[in-house]
């Protein structure tokens, strides 16, 4: 019996397509370059020096994905902003500790590589890196036949930043009397999408149906805000005690992560109005108030704790940086209670 001569391409892996992708994204990657980066794409590992301005540099690392927001993006053939979400989820986690993002790597996996789709995704990643002054130094594109349904892909991101040891923000300085400032979100960001998709399903609503004049898809696929530049500027001009990034777990789980055990955050619900998308979700899904605050950011991307004396400066800095910022609450003694977040 004569066996047909086989190639890797016959097995479903097209090396030439991978090389074509690299060529397409080179210009986008180059725009993210920082002076600390040594060399370019194509090495076995990416090289990056530490910025010389740091006396005791501490590296801060993080990894994340975009959850099932990716499912919605794939279903709607909207690939150009999901990469921004990927970067945002990583760099926002770094900056809350006072860290400046240095470099980013991505992992893109699919059953059959579509160069047009992949390049669109990676252009979005490069866009996010530019917004956060973070170098896209490399990544992995894995073409794995039989592992994914046709048209599907998965994403993960990895980021490393640096902070001066004496300037790490870890919540240890939070004290009774501190003021809480909110930074507005662009929408659900990259959390709660399994529930969002369930609400769409049970309500019989289509993503292209309109909400306040624009398709629901635009509300739900709005890219996650990247707060790096505004928060780093704030840290330079104000005494920041803690920053919480409101991701999975919402208010109830993320704010306590940055609080000492003997205090609580008291949130004034009347200080802001939920975005239309959150009102729609609560109504169409019959979702309880508690569940909304546990699953979604409800219009608040970050919560910052700082002394009352710095509130005016902080609001000015954040507003000038383009943020929607407002006083959302205060820090009080925990007392006899056990809940570290109260929403009144």
From Swiss-Prot:
Pathway: Purine metabolism; IMP biosynthesis via de novo pathway; 5-amino-1-(5-phospho-D-ribosyl)imidazole from N(2)-formyl-N(1)-(5-phospho-D-ribosyl)glycinamide: step 2/2. Coiled coil: none annotated. One of its GO terms (biological process) is adenine biosynthetic process. GO terms for molecular function: ATP binding; phosphoribosylamine-glycine ligase activity; phosphoribosylformylglycinamidine cyclo-ligase activity. Gene3D superfamilies: PurM-like C-terminal domain, PurM-like, N-terminal domain. Its EC number is 6.3.3.1. Its main location: cytoplasm. It comes from the Bacteria. GO terms for cellular component: cytosol. It is found in: Cytoplasm. The keyword ATP-binding applies. The keyword Transmembrane does not apply. Keywords: ATP-binding, Cytoplasm, Ligase, Nucleotide-binding, Purine biosynthesis. It catalyses: 2-formamido-N(1)-(5-O-phospho-beta-D-ribosyl)acetamidine + ATP = 5-amino-1-(5-phospho-beta-D-ribosyl)imidazole + ADP + phosphate + H(+). PANTHER family: TRIFUNCTIONAL PURINE BIOSYNTHETIC PROTEIN ADENOSINE-3, TRIFUNCTIONAL PURINE BIOSYNTHETIC PROTEIN ADENOSINE-3-RELATED. Belongs to the AIR synthase family. This is Phosphoribosylformylglycinamidine cyclo-ligase.
């Amino acid at each position: 019996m004569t066996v047909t001569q086989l190639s890797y391409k016959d097995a479903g892996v097209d090396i030439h397509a991978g090389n074509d992708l690299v060529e397409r994204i080179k210009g986008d990657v180059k725009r993210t370059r920082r002076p600390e980066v040594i060399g370019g794409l194509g090495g076995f590992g990416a090289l990056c020096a530490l910025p010389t301005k740091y006396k005791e540099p501490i590296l801060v690392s993080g990894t994340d994905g975009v959850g099932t927001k990716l499912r919605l993006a794939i279903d709607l053939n909207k690939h150009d902003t999901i990469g921004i979400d990927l970067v945002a989820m990583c760099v926002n986690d770094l900056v809350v500790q006072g860290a400046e993002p240095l470099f980013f790597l991505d992992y893109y996996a699919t059953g059959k590589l579509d160069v047009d789709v992949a390049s669109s995704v990676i252009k979005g990643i490069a866009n996010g890196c530019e917004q956060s002054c973070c170098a896209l130094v490399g990544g992995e594109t894995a073409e794995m036949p039989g592992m994914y349904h046709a048209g599907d892909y998965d994403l993960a991101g990895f980021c490393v930043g640096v902070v001066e040891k004496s300037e790490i923000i870890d919540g240890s300085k939070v004290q009774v009397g501190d003021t809480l400032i909110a930074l507005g979100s662009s929408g659900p960001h990259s959390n709660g999408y399994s529930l969002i998709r369930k609400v769409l399903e049970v309500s019989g609503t289509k993503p292209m149906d309109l909400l306040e004049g624009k398709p629901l898809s635009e509300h739900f696929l709005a890219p996650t805000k990247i707060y790096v530049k505004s928060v780093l500027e704030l840290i330079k001009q104000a005494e920041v005690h803690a920053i919480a990034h409101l991701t999975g777990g919402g208010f109830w789980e993320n704010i306590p992560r940055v609080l000492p055990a003997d205090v609580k955050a008291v949130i004034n619900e009347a200080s802001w109005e939920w975005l239309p998308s959150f009102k729609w979700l609560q109504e169409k899904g019959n979702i309880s108030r508690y569940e909304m605050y546990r699953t979604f950011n409800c219009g608040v991307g970050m919560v910052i704790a700082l002394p009352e004396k710095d509130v005016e400066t902080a609001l000015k800095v954040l507003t000038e940086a383009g943020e929607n910022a407002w006083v959302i609450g205060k820090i009080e003694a925990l007392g006899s209670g056990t809940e570290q977040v109260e929403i009144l």
